[in-house]
Amino acid sequence: MKIMVLHGPNLNLLGKREPSVYGSVTLEEINQKLAELAGELGVEICCKQSNSEGELVDLLHRAAEEADAVVFNPGAFTHYSYALRDAVSAIGIPTIEVHLSNIYSREDFRKHSVIAPVASGHICGMGVTGYLLALRAAAALAGT
């Protein structure tokens, strides 16, 4: 079983960008924790990060061919990217939306996700633990 983990815009800056909101953990550290859990679960993961909406759409399309599920942090695209929403809807595999921060306790424009209604699940506000829960959920939904 393979799960694709997609990190959206600005997540490459984790550890430096607003640590009071996102914590001090880096993207590399998140990916390492995910790899450790994947080993325990007996699943393969492929982690990708992009600041480009179009590239994320392409990666979601690729996931439909190469993976059994997706863990997806769309970053700021969460709030307005109908292209990503349509891609999640179209791929036909379990997709868990995840956010480090609680988007519902932040600025008004961040309190709405256009992705959540078409995702299999939505986890936010739990920091790195949210990613680990999302990986467990994706694996369970994909059938392990």
UniProtKB/Swiss-Prot annotation:
Keywords: Amino-acid biosynthesis, Aromatic amino acid biosynthesis, Lyase. GO terms for molecular function: 3-dehydroquinate dehydratase activity. The keyword Amino-acid biosynthesis applies. The keyword Amino-acid biosynthesis applies. It catalyses: 3-dehydroquinate = 3-dehydroshikimate + H2O. Its EC number is 4.2.1.10. SUPFAM superfamilies: Type II 3-dehydroquinate dehydratase. Catalyzes a trans-dehydration via an enolate intermediate. Belongs to the type-II 3-dehydroquinase family. Homododecamer. This is 3-dehydroquinate dehydratase. The gene is aroQ.
